[in-house]
């Protein structure tokens, strides 16, 4: 990728990451239960922002480089890398929150234990807490981040196709 594209990607990826961190912090301060897994206002805003920010960043790129004729691959790379940088920053921030705020971790354990108890009633909360704490190690968070990139690939392909069709 050309240097001018990489600067654009890193710049917009950092902006996306900091906006996602700001939204996470806002919901964390308002009510930390929004950060728990599931479909809620936080997850909806997070996904909508992720998609629309990438779309509008790509539109800015196209307007800045109007004289060039770019292909789908270039659009896809730019869009995906913006999401990659933004979600990485956001994921690392969430990891810090869960590892340094014991109350948030306990809320997570209680929330997921209530679902786990339906599946396996003999599982104690201490066993479940140990299981969950293993999932919040740095390596497991990186692994979780990699799986987060799968939907980002799909979003990038759709956004790139839309930009290519609009152009």
Region annotations inferred by a language model:
Residues 12-21, 47-51, 79-87, 91, ...:
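Alpha-helical transmembrane spans of integral membrane proteins, capturing the lipid-embedded, hydrophobic core
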Residues 30-45, 129-146:
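Membrane-embedded or membrane-proximal helical elements that form or frame transporter/channel pores
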């Amino acid at each position: 990728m050309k240097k001018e594209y990489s600067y654009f990607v890193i710049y917009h990826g950092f902006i996306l990451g900091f906006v996602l961190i700001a939204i996470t912090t806002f919901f964390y301060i308002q009510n930390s239960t929004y950060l728990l897994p599931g479909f809620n206002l936080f997850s909806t805003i997070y996904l909508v922002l992720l998609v629309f920010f990438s779309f509008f960043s790509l539109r800015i790129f196209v307007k800045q480089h109007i004289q060039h004729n770019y292909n789908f691959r270039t659009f896809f790379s730019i869009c995906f890398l913006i999401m990659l940088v933004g979600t990485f920053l956001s994921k690392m921030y969430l990891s810090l929150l869960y590892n340094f705020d014991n109350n948030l971790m306990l809320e997570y354990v209680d929330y997921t234990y209530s679902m786990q108890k339906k599946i396996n009633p003999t599982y104690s909360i201490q066993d479940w807490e140990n299981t969950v704490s293993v999932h919040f190690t740095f390596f497991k968070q990186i692994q979780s981040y990699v799986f987060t990139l799968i939907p980002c690939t799909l979003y990038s392909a759709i956004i790139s196709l839309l930009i290519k069709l609009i152009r």
